[in-house]
Amino acid sequence: MIMAGGTGGHVFPGLAVARSMQANGWRIVWLGTRNGMEAALVPQHGFSIELINFSGLRGKKLSSYLLLPWRLAQACWQSFRILRRQQPQVVLGMGGYPALPGGIMAVLLGKPLLIHEQNRIAGLTNKILAKIADRILLAFPGALTSPENKTRVTGNPVRTEIARLPSPEARYAHRTGNLHILVVGGSLGAQVLNTVLPQALSMIPEDQRPYVTHQSGKAHLDALQQAYADHGVTGNLVAFIENMAAHYQDCDLVICRAGALTISELAAAGVASILIPYPYAVDDHQTANARFLSDYQAAVLWPQSELTAASLAQWLMTCSRAQLQSMATHARALAMPEAAQTVAEACQQLSGQTNEA
């Protein structure tokens, strides 16, 4: 059983593990929440899902905290019934709301429990479950403090097509002409990127101006198209990108937020990046994520408070493709492309080598 929900940063790595395990003959059942993206996304990928009622609390009203014991008890009871019915041989918590009650009940029912932490600063669910889990898997060293014999650094599971891209040397070496930039705001878009990018491009002489693919998020596409038009610049403007591997392969530079899965994809693909962490992320974990690349000259960490159109335009005009190739090579050196298979193997080892999860 895989438990994950709430955001793509939990769900997509879980799906990568699920595909790896399914390919080895495992039966996969997912535990998610009714209101999370996993409720629709997991069945679309061909996996069965069981749903409980539970959600996050950070930033909510006092009444939500007062109701927490009741809501957690209800979610634990729902998880208990699902676990009794499904009888998984091993339970993998990938973080997010459903993993807390599911993980607690898995341990009480004597099911082997593994957890996987995607960020450099662990989320609340995994901080709690780390105290009772049989195995702790980490994307980044030091995210959770736990006994060495229980802990293993695996990296973040990413899509196979990204992990199998050609090397940066093969991709960058023969490119000429203006830079190709990929701007990724995530599924909901990043408004600061939608505002700053067209303005910065307008400050670059037309013969030096990069080619841009800009993913805006569905709700912001019309406004982004207007912003590009207002500044007299052009780009390939899209609401959502389905084939990220192809875009990683074709671009010289990615400008994006610093979610854990994004960091792992950039490393696996071997792409240079400017990382602008979301400043209101819980525990500022995106800044910590970004440093995993920037500390090794694999990316530029650019705080949102310091980002201006003029400074970005100047940076883009002075950087060279050779510098970007060097960043991309450093990024690829940090990759752990077999993470999905490594997590799957850890589940199998803990389960006693059966084919039901």
Curated annotation (Swiss-Prot):
It catalyses: di-trans,octa-cis-undecaprenyl diphospho-N-acetyl-alpha-D-muramoyl-L-alanyl-D-glutamyl-meso-2,6-diaminopimeloyl-D-alanyl-D-alanine + UDP-N-acetyl-alpha-D-glucosamine = di-trans,octa-cis-undecaprenyl diphospho-[N-acetyl-alpha-D-glucosaminyl-(1->4)]-N-acetyl-alpha-D-muramoyl-L-alanyl-D-glutamyl-meso-2,6-diaminopimeloyl-D-alanyl-D-alanine + UDP + H(+). GO terms for cellular component: plasma membrane. Pathway: Cell wall biogenesis; peptidoglycan biosynthesis. GO terms for biological process: carbohydrate metabolic process; cell division; cell wall organization; lipid glycosylation; peptidoglycan biosynthetic process; regulation of cell shape. HAMAP family: MurG. It is a peripheral membrane protein. The keyword Membrane applies. UDP-N-acetyl-alpha-D-glucosamine binds at T7, G8, G9, N119, R159, S187, I241, Q286. It comes from Nitrosomonas europaea (strain ATCC 19718 / CIP 103999 / KCTC 2705 / NBRC 14298). Its main location: membrane. This is UDP-N-acetylglucosamine--N-acetylmuramyl-(pentapeptide) pyrophosphoryl-undecaprenol N-acetylglucosamine transferase. Its EC number is 2.4.1.227. Belongs to the glycosyltransferase 28 family. MurG subfamily. Keywords: Cell cycle, Cell division, Cell inner membrane, Cell membrane, Cell shape, Cell wall biogenesis/degradation, Glycosyltransferase, Membrane, Peptidoglycan synthesis, Transferase. SUPFAM superfamilies: UDP-Glycosyltransferase/glycogen phosphorylase. It holds the Pfam family Glyco_tran_28_C. It is found in: Cell inner membrane. Cell wall formation. Catalyzes the transfer of a GlcNAc subunit on undecaprenyl-pyrophosphoryl-MurNAc-pentapeptide (lipid intermediate I) to form undecaprenyl-pyrophosphoryl-MurNAc-(pentapeptide)GlcNAc (lipid intermediate II). InterPro entries: GlcNAc_MurG, Glyco_trans_28_C, GlycoTrans_28_N. It is an enzyme of class 2 (transferase). GO terms for molecular function: UDP-N-acetyl-D-glucosamine:N-acetylmuramoyl-L-alanyl-D-glutamyl-meso-2,6-diaminopimelyl-D-alanyl-D-alanine-diphosphoundecaprenol 4-beta-N-acetylglucosaminlytransferase activity; undecaprenyldiphospho-muramoylpentapeptide beta-N-acetylglucosaminyltransferase activity.
